[in-house]
Amino acid sequence: MKKSVRPAASKVSGERGKPEVAGNAAAGKPASKSSTAAPLSKVKSSDDLLAAMAGGNPASCNAVSKSKRTTSVGTTASTLDSKPKTASGTTSKRLASSLSKETNLTRDRLRTSRASANKKQSAAGPVGGDAASGKRSRGQTLAESEGRMSKSKSDGQISDKVALETKVKDLLGLAKSKDVEILHLRSELRDMRAQLGLGGEEPQEGAVEEEKPHVSAITAADVESTLILLQEQNQAIREELNLLKSENRMLKDRLNALGFSLEQRLDGSDKLFSYASLSPDLAAGSGQSDGGGTGTLASSVEGSAPGSLEDLLTGHQHGGSADNLDSESSEVYQAVTSSDDALDAPSGASSSSESECAPSRERSRRGSSGNASEVSVACLTERIHQMEENQHSTAEELQATLQELADLQQITQELNGENERLGEEKVILMDSLCQQSDKLELYGRQIEYLRSLLDEHHVSYVLEEDIKSGRYMELEQRYADLAENGRFEREQLLGVQQHLSNTLKMAEQDNAEAQEMIGALKERNHQMERIMESERQGRAAVEATLEEYKEVASSDQAELSRCRAQLEQERQRVAELYSLHTAGDKNDICQLLEGVRLGKEEAEAKAAKLQEGLEQAHGELSHLRETFSKLDREYREFQEQAQQQMGEQERALEKQRLDLQEKETEVADMKETIFELEDEVEQHRALKLHDNLIITDLENSVKKLQDQKHDMEREIKILHRRLREESMEWRQFQADLQTAVVIANDIKSEAQEEIGDLRRRLQEAQEKNEKLSKELEEVKSRKQDEERGRVYNYMNAVERDLAALRQGMGLSRRSSTSSEPSPTVKTLIKSFDSASQGPPSSGASVTPTASAAPLPRTPLSPSPMKTPPAAAVSPIQRHSVSGSMSAAKPLSSLGDKRPTYPDISLPAEHLLRGSAAGRPPSALQRVSNMDSTKAISVSRRSSEEMKRDMAAPDGASSASLMAMSAASSPLALASSSPTASVTPTTRSRLREERKDPLSALAREYGGSKRNALLKWCQKKTEGYQNIDITNFSSSWNDGLAFCAVLHTYLPAHIPYQELTSQEKRRNFTLAFQAAESVGIKCTLDINEMVHTERPDWQSVMTYVTAIYKYFET
């Protein structure tokens, strides 16, 4: 899952920003022909590369290229005179660092150039719109401006794409020119090595060698001056590295204060980016420090070239944190160096580790902002990765929990069914108990009656012993218990009946209260209806009054119209009179006018009166209308209130009806329950009568069983006698076997002493080797050429001695395996006695070298108890051993299966073989002298205690012998059977664990079975590198977790120190083959596991469960 992210990003950014520097790349080729101009050409080409990657602003490009050129020239000026040629590792580091350091700068400049282009495009649109606004309408102007903006955007994108393609082509040409320079420098390096008289060829990785002309030989004076300059430069670089280390510590403290930690595990991409960002100056300094340590230019190149950046990265990918970077990089450096520069490896390793730990000069000049941003991105990436892992682990745990809940629900259903069945059986037993109690009371009365008769007739009687027997007491106790249970259940039933009666009474009370409430609501409804009726009557009276007033108003209107008609007539008459007055006699006319005026006054007075009456009638009419509208509004409001109250009363009534119906149904159900209980009582009485007959039959059968019991007791006594005889034979056999174990312990102690001597010799040789290497380092600065040959000769001699020592140990192991005793106990004892008394032969003296004392438990050491049978015995032999060792059954089963001496000889032979060949040599080499001496003293004390116990009288029991043998050595633990002291409860628990092996693990660790198995795996893989088990999917995708778990049991099958997380197929193949070798069937597909990043967690958990079941249950 850990894939390289930063290299890919740098590659993409490198492809985006491509300059037009084909001329500079072409100029780099002729510049590399001369030896003095080669570093300068590299500096120029790297500056061109930086300028090309910047690509955006020409002014900034020139400024950056000038600063880069001055920095590179200033840092490498001291090396131009003394070191005319540079190794391929330095060039590759220079190129990788320059590419990685300029990645972020290129991205920023591309973004700024695009932002400026977008601003120009956005500014061009409104200007064009303003120029065309005077000629066209607003709609046409907007359409044209949008079209121009889209066209300018598309043109800008096309131009950016073309520029990027040209930059990509230029960078490809520049990379090819760099490859040519690297090949040229490598050929010059070979020529220099040939001139200095050093053999061997420089290892190359995928590069084609080109033939170059030889350069003239360098004189000894030039070499000495070069060495002196290199030593001075090495000293200066070391001082600068110390300063940078202190600055690095300060930056780490600042990062820790900000909340970021460098000790978190980074992805491979982050590691690659951080390593690739080392400056070319420090890479050159690393090569110079190597040269200062060895004394020649060629040796410095030879010491730094194999430990290139790629080798260091591949070696560090297995590391745990950034703190152990120095040790891991030095180990990788020593591993990849050739045999010719073996003496230069320590100095090269130290300088390369220092160059890796220290940040570059460029990065220190840029400040801590770039480091903080890179570390923050790395930390965020790691946190996101951890969050994804936690999410998947949580989902996996939830699925496992749901499965376990489903299983528990199924078990609960089964237990409920079992509980119901037991309840039914209990009811039947209660009925039978009641019948038996009644019968017992009847029999008791009969017995009392018969005793009274015997007392009256003075007849002596004696109770039979059977009545006083244990069965009688048992039956009496059972009767008391059943009577107590019957009383308790009877009280429960009475309580239930009382509860039902109380519930019925409460329901009746609630019903009565509901009826009373219903009556009150009905009465209130009638009252509201009466009020509504009275209101209706009042409204009818008001309407009648209103009709009367309307009639009066209509009569007044008719009178007013009549008066108006008369007024019109009088006016006509007045007009006639005026006409007569003008034509006739004035006196008559005056009289008539006077009469008419009087009539007019009377008519006007009458009209005024009628007008006042009309106005008064109108006022009364309006008042009546207002009163009527007010009464109408009040009536409507009252009607609405009455309807609302009626609706509420109807709803309350409906609710009370529903409650009443529910109460009635409850009462009916209670009555039905009472009827059913009465029926059940009748049925139980009938069953009681039937069970009485069954009890009589059972009593008859009990008598027959008692007779059979007496017969079985006699047979048991006979079997006990046989058992005593066979136990005596078994004790004798155990004594013989203990004697063999004691002799084996003595031989084992002698072998451990010899192993201690060999280890002391080996340690002395190693100390001597270290002293001589230190002396070699001191003398090497004065006489380098002469001392190199001597040291090589000495190292070869030491290696030959060590190879001869290992070969002798291997021959001793083979001779020990070939000189095995015959597979019988008597011949074993005779051979052990002869070996302890007589002088030891060559095979016998070498045999104990392969047996190891109880070793301290380390992550890569085998399991102390289960390794010898599993690692050195085939599956068929293992099952035969376990089958024959389980012959020590409980004493009750020895009457059928009696072990003989030939049956036990095979386990003894395999036990001795396991003690002699179970431990691999690697495990022996990891044990210190102190541990071996302690183990020897413990084995001696245990053998002496065994001899004293064997001298004790023969009355000791077999259990004590088994305890002493278990204390003497682990072999006796394997030979003694653990089933002799197993109780029935533990035996049932063992059967349960075999059926479900994770149940015991869940009880031990707590929580679910999945989490318990996960904790067990974590505990087993403690101390193993690159193992972090948090789930059953992604934590197992590289096969290392399987190998680590199986390595704790089968260390001989899995070379864990040689495994890597990249070789997934090999890891899975080794793990599955090791598991199949002991009988664990493989249920996983290797192809699917290799190609799947997150395998099916249920399949993985099933396979891990099979491993746990095989080795732990």
Swiss-Prot record:
<feature type="region of interest" description="Disordered">
    <location>
        <begin position="972"/>
        <end position="997"/>
    </location>
</feature>
<feature type="region of interest" description="Disordered">
    <location>
        <begin position="766"/>
        <end position="785"/>
    </location>
</feature>
<feature type="compositionally biased region" description="Polar residues">
    <location>
        <begin position="59"/>
        <end position="103"/>
    </location>
</feature>
<feature type="region of interest" description="Disordered">
    <location>
        <begin position="284"/>
        <end position="374"/>
    </location>
</feature>
<dbReference type="GO" id="GO:0051301">
    <property type="term" value="P:cell division"/>
</dbReference>
<feature type="region of interest" description="Disordered">
    <location>
        <begin position="914"/>
        <end position="957"/>
    </location>
</feature>
<keyword id="KW-0965">Cell junction</keyword>
<keyword id="KW-0132">Cell division</keyword>
<keyword id="KW-0303">Gap junction</keyword>
<feature type="compositionally biased region" description="Basic and acidic residues">
    <location>
        <begin position="941"/>
        <end position="951"/>
    </location>
</feature>
<dbReference type="Pfam" id="PF00307">
    <property type="entry name" value="CH"/>
</dbReference>
<keyword id="KW-0175">Coiled coil</keyword>
<comment type="subunit">
    <text>May interact with both microtubules and actin cytoskeleton.</text>
</comment>
<comment type="function">
    <text>Involved in cytokinesis and spindle organization. May play a role in actin cytoskeleton organization and microtubule stabilization and hence required for proper cell adhesion and migration.</text>
</comment>
<dbReference type="GO" id="GO:0005921">
    <property type="term" value="C:gap junction"/>
</dbReference>
<comment type="similarity">
    <text>Belongs to the cytospin-A family.</text>
</comment>
<dbReference type="InterPro" id="IPR036872">
    <property type="entry name" value="CH_dom_sf"/>
</dbReference>
<feature type="coiled-coil region">
    <location>
        <begin position="473"/>
        <end position="791"/>
    </location>
</feature>
<feature type="coiled-coil region">
    <location>
        <begin position="379"/>
        <end position="433"/>
    </location>
</feature>
<dbReference type="InterPro" id="IPR001715">
    <property type="entry name" value="CH_dom"/>
</dbReference>
<feature type="coiled-coil region">
    <location>
        <begin position="220"/>
        <end position="259"/>
    </location>
</feature>
<feature type="compositionally biased region" description="Low complexity">
    <location>
        <begin position="972"/>
        <end position="981"/>
    </location>
</feature>
<keyword id="KW-0963">Cytoplasm</keyword>
<feature type="compositionally biased region" description="Low complexity">
    <location>
        <begin position="834"/>
        <end position="845"/>
    </location>
</feature>
<dbReference type="GO" id="GO:0060325">
    <property type="term" value="P:face morphogenesis"/>
</dbReference>
<feature type="compositionally biased region" description="Pro residues">
    <location>
        <begin position="856"/>
        <end position="867"/>
    </location>
</feature>
<feature type="region of interest" description="Disordered">
    <location>
        <begin position="832"/>
        <end position="902"/>
    </location>
</feature>
<feature type="region of interest" description="Disordered">
    <location>
        <begin position="1"/>
        <end position="160"/>
    </location>
</feature>
<dbReference type="GO" id="GO:0005737">
    <property type="term" value="C:cytoplasm"/>
</dbReference>
<keyword id="KW-0206">Cytoskeleton</keyword>
<dbReference type="InterPro" id="IPR050540">
    <property type="entry name" value="F-actin_Monoox_Mical"/>
</dbReference>
<protein>
    <recommendedName>
        <fullName>Cytospin-A</fullName>
    </recommendedName>
</protein>
<dbReference type="GO" id="GO:0005819">
    <property type="term" value="C:spindle"/>
</dbReference>
<feature type="compositionally biased region" description="Polar residues">
    <location>
        <begin position="925"/>
        <end position="940"/>
    </location>
</feature>
<feature type="domain" description="Calponin-homology (CH)">
    <location>
        <begin position="1007"/>
        <end position="1112"/>
    </location>
</feature>
<feature type="compositionally biased region" description="Low complexity">
    <location>
        <begin position="338"/>
        <end position="358"/>
    </location>
</feature>
<keyword id="KW-0131">Cell cycle</keyword>
<feature type="compositionally biased region" description="Basic and acidic residues">
    <location>
        <begin position="145"/>
        <end position="154"/>
    </location>
</feature>
